[in-house]
Amino acid sequence: MNAQVKRLLQVASLALVSFAAVGPASAGSATGLWIDHTGRGGIEISNCGANLCGRLVWLKDEKNSKACGTQIIGNVKPVAGGKWDGGWIYDPDQGAKYSVEITPMGDKLKVMGYQGSKFLSETMIWRRASGELKRCSA
């Protein structure tokens, strides 16, 4: 193998490693800080072992601060196609838990809550928070 080919392979390997090392809050990731579909809550989604979990960390109406820190997403597992499924989401307005499928779409997050069948589901689009939010205190 000549020196140019070796050098090209080294550069290509370094580029692949660099792309793989992009942090979890990259544009195609479900982790990070998200504004929910109502615009009233900020949820921080993070890795919890091999799964995802999420907590309410910002509230537009600080009078509802008792909900601050509530875990509203849990045990969501990676599945094919970059999606996450098999966990749960808590709806504080309804006081109920549902199954959830999460699909990252750049700076948007498709969050589908369902009970039993995905045929009977509600899909919400969350958007990535553009900056730092003043976190509520739990």
Question: What spans do the regions from the language model cover?
Answer:
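Sec/Tat signal peptide C-region and signal peptidase I cleavage site
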Residues: V22-A27
